[in-house]
Amino acid sequence: MAKTNISPGMQQYLDIKKDYPDAFLLFRMGDFYELFYEDAVKAAQLLEIGLTSRNKNAENPIPMAGVPHHSAQQYIDVLIELGYKVAVAEQMEDPKQAVGVVKREVVQVITPGTVVDSAKPDSANNFLVAVDFDGCRYGLAYMDVSTGEFCVTDLADFTSVRSEIQNLKAKEVLLGFDLSEEEQTILVKQMNLLLSYEETVYEDKSLIDGQLTTVELTAAGKLLQYVHKTQMRELSHLQALVHYEIKDYLQMSYATKSSLDLVENARTNKKHGSLYWLLDETKTAMGMRLLRSWIDRPLVSKEAILERQEIIQVFLNAFIERTDLSNSLKGVYDIERLSSRVSFGKANPKDLLQLGHTLAQVPYIKAILESFDSPCVDKLVNDIDSLPELEYLIRTAIDPDAPATISEGSIIRNGFDERLDHYRKVMREGTGWIADIEAKERQASGINNLKIDYNKKDGYYFHVTNSNLSLVPEHFFRKATLKNSERYGTAELAKIEGQMLEAREESSSLEYDIFMCIRAQVETYINRLQKLAKILATVDVLQSLAVVAETNHYIRPQFNDNHVITIQEGRHAVVEKVMGVQEYIPNSISFDQQTSIQLITGPNMSGKSTYMRQLALTVIMAQMGSFVAADHVDLPLFDAIFTRIGAADDLISGQSTFMVEMMEANQAIKRASDNSLILFDELGRGTATYDGMALAQAIIEYIHDRVGAKTIFATHYHELTDLSTKLTSLVNVHVATLEKDGDVTFLHKIAEGPADKSYGIHVAKIAGLPKSLLKRADEVLTRLETQSRSTEIISVPSQVESSSAVRQGQLSLFGDEEKTHEIRQALEAIDVMNMTPLQAMTTLYELKKLL
């Protein structure tokens, strides 16, 4: 960056830029925001704008790019979306009145985690996350600057931190400590996060309660410091810090939520095809955000769940009132975001009109809720604050046709302010007054062509031609002399002109001041507005769940304390919605007190994964308070759901399918309790057959003997079905098929007992593989079934199948391979029953190196 012969203006730019080295600096110059040096070069590429230079003829011209100030937001949005920060430097004085260089200051730093003014507003939350570490536990705080939501918790390990960041869908993470290289790689490379750093703790007793752990206080304080440092203003909309515990909600990792398509479809990354899509009949942006939060964090408190259920039931029983409620909610704007715009000093007349329109709807909503005549609904009604005085202020002050900007005028209603009304009257009637003066003076003077004209130099004046100069009255005074005429003024005309000019100037200034005063008054109501927003959002979500329950014929689930699962004719709610009720085949699911594991066998495409997901979605919907897709449901309360459904390599982190399988299995068996739900689909398929089968068996036994969680384990390893004779809490189920005249029909129904065939070749036939290939596969299958003998399920840790059995059962297609005595000894020494899956994986890896 060459600095020779730098002008005062460019020196000012460089002085500001050095304080914001990690941000694009938008430097206001007149009607443009300019970027210089490296910022200009990079921005020109990213924003596809022209790159020019300042001082083109100089030895070292300065690269320059710019965007118009009125459209700058769309360019800022692009940079933020790409993960960059933007510092905005404004002119702090009128350039016409400036002495020397115009004073400029950065007024805001916009980052991916602090977006408020996007040109494409999104109803979803945008959380900024802060993490600190005290050497033992992690403090994690998060905030949505656009709504003021502010929460904190503490977590035991980095895996939990990573999962919570993913669940929050954060784009920026603020760190108060040094990460390891591996942790930094995870956050930056794998999760594509912008990392920012903050060391100073901001103390605000009005927001942060002291009854927190030290690491929670530092995480929350550093987050607050960063927000104040970037936004550079008082933020009255920030809500008091809320402490939460992960254990107070149904725990699910980001991978689990993704595999279950909770908030977006994992294949399309779109809302359509997700549980969120299915349940979203909300009418407000606040309701949409809250619904997503409920799906993300189902409850574990039976009392809280039943409270939600009760209100949904009341709404279900009153169709007309619920319809009126839904229609009224359509008139409710995003109170949380509008409040934040007021707090940021960015609310325009349209924003206040939306707020006023919303408040005008509240009495109707309150009356409808009262008409339900229900004690559980009355709890919501009693907390509704209609803010009638604020609604009256906005209604009487802001013109309903006011523009979106505060510089165009016509903002304030007539009748609200006497001075403003007077100025408007002067501007409105001034032209008439001038016409009256013109007519009066023409008649009095006898100058028939006397007229009043206007220009910027002379203002209003009487135009008198030379031929009529002798008729000019004495009270006229000369303002200008032209070749063929004279320009005159009068005291009366000057007075009217002064009034009109004053009215024009003062009206604009006064209207601006009045609007600012009104906005300041609105700001004093922010806390009450935020409380109202929460209640309306809750009402919106509950009516949405009632609408969905009625539309799809859902039932109210029950809960028990005896670890029994009973689902009669259950459906996968999302699949049913996509397929249609007529095509979907329901399935019942039953776990009695003695059953902890269902081992499910059956061919691909037969419905095993759907059956497992059906159970998970039923649990999630039930524990978020929703009604569910079944004829009858009775469930225990689960504390966590762990899944491994669907196989895919983690390409970004370089982890194979098998490694991902083992890591997720490890998380499940380490963290699950006997109140958890585990769903494993084809675990072990990512490695060689016998490796996979050995691990699958070991994991099943470990869960059975040590964890006790309710588990569905889907497998292609039919040999594992023999475990039911050795594990008392395991039962076999399978997907029923109908075989007739060589054709196989998958019934998509779960039946008791193990499957007798795999039907893999039939699936290949459905997929359209060539007939010759299928015929060859049949021949190979027949040969394998003839050669191999049934595999013995290992019931004692030291009992390991001989290498000849392994060769005969797995490797006959590829030829025998002699095993060394060393490998045989190593295999015999393995204590399978006392190994974790991760240890088993490591041992297998070491054994393979001996080959």
From Swiss-Prot:
SMART domains from the UniProt entry: MUTSac, MUTSd
Protein name stated in the entry: DNA mismatch repair protein MutS
Binding of ATP, residues: G602, P603, N604, M605, S606, G607, K608, S609
Keyword Zinc-finger among UniProt keywords: no
Family from the record: Belongs to the DNA mismatch repair MutS family.
PROSITE patterns: DNA_MISMATCH_REPAIR_2
Keywords: ATP-binding, DNA damage, DNA repair, DNA-binding, Nucleotide-binding
InterPro entries, per database record: DNA_mismatch_repair_MutS, DNA_mismatch_repair_MutS-lik_N, DNA_mismatch_repair_MutS/MSH, DNA_mismatch_repair_MutS_C, DNA_mismatch_repair_MutS_clamp, DNA_mismatch_repair_MutS_core, DNA_mismatch_repair_MutS_N, DNA_mismatch_repair_MutS_sf
Cross-referenced Pfam families: MutS_I (PF01624), MutS_II (PF05188), MutS_III (PF05192), MutS_IV (PF05190), MutS_V (PF00488)
Organism: Streptococcus pyogenes serotype M3 (strain ATCC BAA-595 / MGAS315)
Known function: This protein is involved in the repair of mismatches in DNA. It is possible that it carries out the mismatch recognition step. This protein has a weak ATPase activity.
GO CC terms in record: cytosol
Gene Ontology terms describing biological process: mismatch repair
Gene it is expressed from: mutS
NCBIfam families linked to this entry: mutS1, PRK05399.1
Molecular function terms from GO: ATP binding; ATP-dependent DNA damage sensor activity; damaged DNA binding; mismatched DNA binding
